[in-house]
C-alpha cells in the first residue's frame, strides 16, 4: 500500500513540475513586455518636446537660447534672450547658443535693408547703382554707365541695358565703305605688280658695252633646254607641259622610253613641248608658268649666255678691225 502512495507522489511531482515552469515563463513574458513598454515610454516624448535626461522639456522660443534644463516633464527650461543686434534665433529650439547676425559688406556693394533682431537675421540689399543677379547674393556689381542712352534702367537684380551709338555705328559703316574700294585698289596694284614681274622675265634685256639692248621675248630656247631641265624637278616639268597642251599619251610615251633616266625624261618633255609650241613667245610661256625663283634662274642662264655671246662677238670684231 505504501508503494502505491510513493508512485502516486512521483506522478504528481512530474506533472506539477512542467506546469510551474510554464507559469513562470508566462510571468517572465509579462514582465518582459512591461519592461519594453516602460523603456519605450522612457525614451519617447510628445511631439514638440525634446528629451533632456529623464524629462521631456519644452523648447526655448525664437529670440532666446537655453541656459538651464527643465526640472520636470512638460516644463520649460531656463531660457535667456539673445544679444540684440548681434545674435538671433528664428525658430523654437533647445540649443544653448544663438546664431550670429550676418554682416552686409559695403566693399562688396551691399548695405543693410533690415537690421538684425533677436528673432530675425540681417537682410542685405545692393547699394544704389549696384546689382546682383545670383541667389544667394554674396556681392553686388556696379551698374553699367550708358553713353548713348538707356533701354532699361539698372535694378537691384539686373544690369543697365544701353542703347548703341547710332552715330558711332554710322561712322563704322562710312569707314567700311571707304575701306572697301581702297582695299580693292591695293589688291589690283599688287596683282598688277606680280604680273609685271613675270612679264619682266619675258621683256628682260641684256645690254652690251655700246648700250644696245637684246629683247628675250623670242629667244631661241633650243640650246638652253638641258640647262633649264637641270633646274626643274620632273614633277614641275610634267605639270608645265601638261598645262601647255601636251597630250597625256605623249607624256607617257616619253616617260616609258626613258624609264631609268629622269634627266633625259625632263629634257625630252621640254624639247617636245618646244618643238610643238615654236620659238615665238616660248620663253614668256615658260617663265610665266614657273615659280618666281625658278623663273629668275632660267632668266639668268639665258641672259648670261647671250651677254657672253655678244661680248665674244665684239672682241672678234675688234680683232678683225686691228688686222
Curated annotation (Swiss-Prot):
Output the superkingdom of the source species.
Eukaryota
Output the Gene Ontology cellular-component terms: CD95 death-inducing signaling complex; external side of plasma membrane; membrane raft
In the record, biological process GO terms are: activation-induced cell death of T cells; immune response; motor neuron apoptotic process; necroptotic signaling pathway; negative regulation of apoptotic process; regulation of stress-activated MAPK cascade
From the UniProt record, list the TNFR-Cys repeat ranges: 45-80, 81-124, 125-163
Detail the disulphide connectivity of this chain as listed in its UniProt entry.
Answer: 45-56, 57-70, 60-79, 82-98, 101-116, 104-124, 126-140, 143-154, 146-162
Topology check: give the Cytoplasmic ranges. 189-323
Q: Where is the signal peptide?
A: 1-22
Task: Tell me which Gene3D superfamilies the record gives.
Answer: Death Domain, Fas, Tumor Necrosis Factor Receptor, subunit A, domain 2
Death domain ranges (all copies): 238-306
Q: How does it assemble?
A: Binds DAXX. Interacts with HIPK3. Part of a complex containing HIPK3 and FADD. Binds RIPK1 and FAIM2. Interacts with BABAM2 and FEM1B. Interacts with FADD. Interacts directly (via DED domain) with NOL3 (via CARD domain); inhibits death-inducing signaling complex (DISC) assembly by inhibiting the increase in FAS-FADD binding induced by FAS activation. Interacts with CALM. In the absence of stimulation, interacts with BIRC2, DDX3X and GSK3B. The interaction with BIRC2 and DDX3X is further enhanced upon receptor stimulation and accompanied by DDX3X and BIRC2 cleavage.
**What is the name of the protein in this document?**
Tumor necrosis factor receptor superfamily member 6
